[in-house]
């Protein structure tokens, strides 16, 4: 798979992860979606240090990573409040 397909899958998995966490916080899901979280983090680690020469793909990747980081901070904060 190429970089553009990986970024598209990364974004799709992130959107699914957002939905799963909202369901978890509402009580519809019994467990935190840790497996999907690991899968999304794997995309971040895979391309974190890699050189992306296409500026459009670099911008897209960085914006999805920034979105993931802000959601992850939010999820950690809410999870700590629940505990």
Residue ranges of each PLM-predicted region?
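Terminal low-complexity "docking" segments
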Residues: 1-34, 55
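Eukaryotic low-complexity, intrinsically disordered regulatory regions enriched for acidic, serine-
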Residues: 28-79, 83
